[in-house]
């Protein structure tokens, strides 16, 4: 394990909904890659405890998805609150990436960052202000080279670590098939 300012921090959150004023984080996972997208380490995958009242505010899609994956039960049984999960994640990241050097990496990470800013501000501040958002490349490919889109299929498990691994693989796919070297 070696701290390196060129390493990239990948993150995914599962939430009870899309509004950080009302909804909450229920799972967080991170992993670190080198600049060439080789996975160096996977961080803790933590269900974040939320009250039954908070979970009761989820819409039908979230109830179905997070109950079906087993996440709701993991959230109810979790001993970790937002701050606990935040600190464990930061401790992992410190081993691999200096604070303030990695952009926040993943798919639609602007949404994740909104929740981090509200509920895990120390972790949000650990990232550089820039974004490495794979969904940007997907949108550009859809417009400029739509024939490549069928070549990458996501499993859409909506489990944080699975989703991050897919984001890394998706960026590698776009690097090979869309970005000219």
Swiss-Prot record:
Query: What biological function has been recorded for the protein in this entry?
Result: 3'-to-5' exoribonuclease specific for small oligoribonucleotides.
- Record's keyword terms, sorted: Cytoplasm, Exonuclease, Hydrolase, Nuclease
Subcellular localization, as worded in the UniProt entry: Cytoplasm
Please state which protein family the record places this protein in.
Answer: Belongs to the oligoribonuclease family.
Gene Ontology molecular function: 3'-5'-RNA exonuclease activity; nucleic acid binding
Entry-linked InterPro entries: Exonuclease_RNaseT/DNA_pol3 (IPR013520), Oligoribonuclease (IPR022894), RNaseH-like_sf (IPR012337), RNaseH_sf (IPR036397)
What's the name of the protein?
Oligoribonuclease
Where does the record locate the signal sequence feature? none
Active site, UniProt feature: 129
Q: Name one GO biological process term.
A: DNA metabolic process
Read off the NCBIfam families from this record.
Answer: PRK05359.1 (NF003765)
EC numbers on record: 3.1.15.-
Listed under GO cellular component are: cytoplasm
PANTHER family per the record? OLIGORIBONUCLEASE, MITOCHONDRIAL (PTHR11046:SF0)
Cited SUPFAM superfamilies: Ribonuclease H-like
What is one Pfam family matched by this protein? RNase_T
**What enzyme category does the UniProt record give?**
hydrolase
Q: Where is the Exonuclease domain?
A: 8-171
């Amino acid at each position: 394990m070696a701290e390196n300012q060129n390493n990239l921090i990948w993150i995914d959150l599962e939430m009870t909904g899309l509004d950080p004023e009302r909804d909450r984080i229920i799972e967080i996972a991170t992993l670190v890659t080198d600049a060439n997208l080789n996975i160096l380490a996977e961080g803790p995958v933590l269900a974040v405890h939320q009250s039954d009242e908070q979970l009761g505010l989820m819409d039908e899609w979230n109830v179905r998805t997070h109950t079906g994956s087993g996440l709701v039960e993991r959230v109810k049984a979790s001993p970790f609150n937002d701050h606990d999960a935040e600190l464990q994640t930061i401790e992992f990241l410190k081993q691999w990436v200096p604070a303030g050097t990695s952009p926040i990496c993943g798919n639609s990470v602007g949404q994740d960052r909104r929740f981090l800013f509200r509920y895990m501000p120390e972790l949000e501040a650990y990232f550089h202000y820039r974004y490495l958002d794979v969904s940007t490349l997907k949108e550009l490919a859809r417009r400029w080279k739509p024939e490549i889109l069928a070549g990458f299929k996501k499993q859409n498990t909506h489990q944080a670590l699975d989703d991050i691994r897919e984001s890394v693989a998706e960026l590698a796919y776009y690097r090979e098939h869309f970005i000219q070297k």
